[in-house]
Amino acid sequence: MSNAITMGIFWHLIGAASAACFYAPFKQVKQWSWETMWSIGGIVSWLILPWTISALLLPDFWAYYSSFNLSTLLPVFLFGAMWGIGNINYGLTMRYLGMSMGIGIAIGITLIVGTLMTPIINGNFDVLINTEGGRMTLLGVLVALIGVGIVTRAGQLKERKMGITAEEFNLKKGLLLAVMCGIFSAGMSFAMNAAKPMHEAAAALGVDPLYVALPSYVVIMGGGALINLGFCFVRLAKVKNLSIKADFSLAKSMIITNILLSALGGLMWYLQFFFYAWGHARIPPQYDYISWMLHMSFYVLCGGIVGLVLKEWKNAGRRPVSVLSLGCVVIIIAANIVGMGMAS
């Protein structure tokens, strides 16, 4: 396996670790509605950071974006909005199916859809079937899916042992939302694929290869921001027990602390895709669809490890932890299989 591929896998791991940890600061926010907290974090992660970093990278910010016609920018924006819809459905999936089953189904679907639909859309699916490297990467995707399933099973065992149930369990509604969430969340993968002309234009301007995807985030995350912030603002305006005024009527020190914690959560959320861009840049172009599989499977892996470190599994018993450990090992094996496939 070449150093470039190894580093690509490593950066995807770092990005996924940030994704697995980003909600920790949000959990420390006190006496604020979820909508206010999520909006502050979202403004940082979807608007401030993409625009600021792009302004630092590009020699002429406005000239870069104005060089693209609507037929290039619109699909990128709409796929970003598609991801935003999946993101909103994610929380509802947890409500109706519970954390483990909801995550397992949603992540499993988005892993498959986001990974395999890209080469199909590009007319390159034959590379998966007719080449040794393609078949090996396809095997890696399958093994990763098995790993996600094992981790999901561990979570179910943990919830059963600790008496944790879904907030409003509804299998039919939950499964429908999980499928929608999985499909729509793959919009981020499709957006990265649609943004290739933007990456190439950034490279032509002399932007370092590690950073060429970052300017496209202004458009991708702009689409996601429209959906997420729109959802939050509508709820803040219409739901009687939610109020921005009430959230900002707390003691000044608490308001500042909540803003800083929400901003930190937003920063950590953004860093997952900052390092995703680094990892994506190191993956061979013919296998760039594998970036999504690496990100999502590592997200599950890191989520399990973070849970162990934070002692969330302390009272779960030995069996759930053993099953979780097995799932993590399977995901690591999947990453190695994919790496060898890309190197062959």
UniProtKB/Swiss-Prot annotation:
Q: Where are the transmembrane segments?
A: 4-24, 38-58, 68-88, 101-121, 137-157, 175-195, 214-234, 259-279, 290-310, 323-343
Database matches in Pfam families: RhaT
Cysteine pairs forming cystine bridges in this chain are none
UniProt keyword Membrane present: yes
Entry GO MF terms: rhamnose transmembrane transporter activity; symporter activity
User: Its GO CC terms?
Assistant: plasma membrane
Where located? Cell inner membrane
Entry membrane topology: Multi-pass membrane protein
Report which superkingdom the organism of origin falls in. Bacteria
> What InterPro entries does UniProt report for this protein, alphabetically?
L-rhamnose-proton_sym_RhaT
The record's section on NCBIfam families has: PRK13499.1-1, PRK13499.1-3, RhaT
Report the protein's function. Uptake of L-rhamnose across the cytoplasmic membrane with the concomitant transport of protons into the cell (symport system).
Q: Which family does it belong to?
A: Belongs to the L-rhamnose transporter (TC 2.A.7.6) family.
Which protein, by its recorded name, is this?
A: L-rhamnose-proton symporter
Q: Write the lineage as a comma-separated list.
A: Bacteria, Pseudomonadati, Pseudomonadota, Gammaproteobacteria, Enterobacterales
Q: Write the gene name.
A: rhaT
